[in-house]
């Protein structure tokens, strides 16, 4: 199976394979088969629209985890200029599962922080599969407090299965690190915009997710537990993950209807990984617009607005 396509996309993958075969035949024999290729491309687009217009919550969860999906550093490369990565929590070590640093957006200084997964095996291990340890969250907190001192807005990118649950993380007080970030972010006197770009897994996501504006990409997810984890608890088997995903309401559109998410950012046809540059352009445009709006608020109004937003959850 083509790794660029998930199983429910297999009909699209088959058409793309035919298109590639025709291109190779045309190159080898100098034949003009552009009309047939164009016909198949139109058919592929129509089929993609049909499949992606009827995705289940579980299919969206799998898209959010797609191995080709853009990660935080990909968005930083496309959206910002003059990015300077900063390292370490000044307590224990540096955590590669969290990246952050200063940058410019539309020529204005900002602090960018996000979860980072890896592509290849060694990189995945180095990034701990996007699951931060306490030092990652403490690094993020250090950078956010720095941003407040220098009056820089904070932009976070959320993409994690969850905080790392290992013994070493618990020994260094994982829960305290997350809780401290929630406390600090609620009081920071600078605008905060969080964008869920893939998986928004529980407290591991929320630790950089307290904000004035919460965006979610169209095929991202945000939940207190993974569908597999929920299914294992409720039905004693991960095979019920699809049912759990539907019941939990983990998708951007569902969370927007509950007023938890402020903006759903549309993805290119087939998902963000089909056109990362276009996806980044969409995110960039929204961030600029939202920063302009939040930048007009004084600190008291900003904090009151943030408090009211958080207190409105569940009402």
Curated annotation (Swiss-Prot):
A GO MF term: acetyl-CoA carboxylase activity
Top-level EC class: transferase
Pathway: Lipid metabolism; malonyl-CoA biosynthesis; malonyl-CoA from acetyl-CoA: step 1/1
One BP term from GO: malonyl-CoA biosynthetic process
Catalytic activity, EC: 2.1.3.15
Similarity remark: Belongs to the AccA family.
Self-association and partners: Acetyl-CoA carboxylase is a heterohexamer composed of biotin carboxyl carrier protein (AccB), biotin carboxylase (AccC) and two subunits each of ACCase subunit alpha (AccA) and ACCase subunit beta (AccD).
Role description: Component of the acetyl coenzyme A carboxylase (ACC) complex. First, biotin carboxylase catalyzes the carboxylation of biotin on its carrier protein (BCCP) and then the CO(2) group is transferred by the carboxyltransferase to acetyl-CoA to form malonyl-CoA.
Protein name: Acetyl-coenzyme A carboxylase carboxyl transferase subunit alpha
Organism: Pseudomonas entomophila (strain L48)
Gene name in the database record: accA
